[in-house]
Amino acid sequence: MKFIDCHNHSLPSIDDGAENMTMALDMLRIAQKDHISDVILTPHHLNGAFKNHANEVRTSVETLRTACIQNNIQVDLHVGSEVHLTHETVEQLVSGEALTYCDHGQAALIELPKHSIPLGLSLIHI
């Protein structure tokens, strides 16, 4: 049986996940050992500490893919982000500055504010 990790912070030095490439590769080796075939990399965006723009994330994913190939780590990596819900969220998703889930433009992984759920949340459709 294979598994998909749909929320992962293995991109090195980009948010509060992997501190460096060595740690990122170690995390993905463990994923491979645990029969995870696909990893959707979802660094934080707009959460007050991190603003990882889409093209920077795409570049980081490509760098990590290359490192995985060089280290014989056979896990398929997919681009994404964990977008903190702010007044900028919809605009950034529509413009492409924030990444959608798997970079397909169909859905987004949204991180809700820690202390409240915004009014009108159910009305958000892109």
Describe the predicted segments one by one.
Residues 6, 40, 94-105:
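Active-site gating loops and adjacent loop-to-helix segments of metal-dependent hydrolytic enzymes
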Residues 1-74:
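An N-terminally biased module of ancient metal coordination in phosphate/nucleic-acid-related enzymes
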Residues 124-126:
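Conserved small/polar residues in nucleotide/adenosyl-binding loops
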Residues 117-121:
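Active-site-adjacent beta->alpha loops and helix N-cap segments on the catalytic face
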Residues 16-17, 112-115:
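Short, flexible loop segments at the rims of nucleotide/cofactor-binding pockets, characterized by
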Residues 103-109, 122:
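HAD-like small-molecule phosphatases
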Residues 64, 91-92:
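N-terminal Rossmann-like or analogous alpha/beta NTP/dinucleotide-binding catalytic cores
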Residues 2, 10, 47-48, 71-89, ...:
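Metal-cofactor-binding active-site regions of metalloenzymes
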